[in-house]
């Protein structure tokens, strides 16, 4: 109670109020990448929305998982991905976890990394795209506009390919997280451009080949990566909404990794999809 006197070294337990699950629980095959008492991180497949109210979404599958595992909490997403974007989706298990990890996102200590395939050959090995963006007049897509909110998208080129008709597979990457490895903060310049996570396949594109890039997102505007690369003349492969040639496949964007500081232990955690 407010009248209780506490001393240094005392252990205090806080009972979190039970909450009603706010989405209809629907059984779904979730690929869980990481879980602790405060967070759940899953690998979102292509073709599924995160939390649409008018159709079955990932939120329904998470609600079912919570129900089956006795997690009496609302589903709180800390990030969003477009329907056809795959990879790391982060869910907080409490309001406290949501608040603390959202603060990390706001100050960019919660890192969000993506892998993308873009049309054409990107000349710069790396760059930081700082652009103002807002929703366009049609209400469907977003655009670079001086009146918009400033965004920052950093990228580093992983590999460049000339045009050859081969398979696509960024969204078919092997999903894994090795929790036994030392968690490290990987900077753009330290990326192994020939490592196992780099997709070597080639896409159909009427433009001169395509480029594979590693992207770090510093802000979270809707369609930010798609708009940024379209603005510099290299839309994501297959992203017809933003000017790419049709390929018959979803656009190529994967939320490849998140890096954050554990809210209880202070340990730096890396989770890879």
Residue ranges with predicted function:
Residues 1-273:
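RNA pseudouridine synthases
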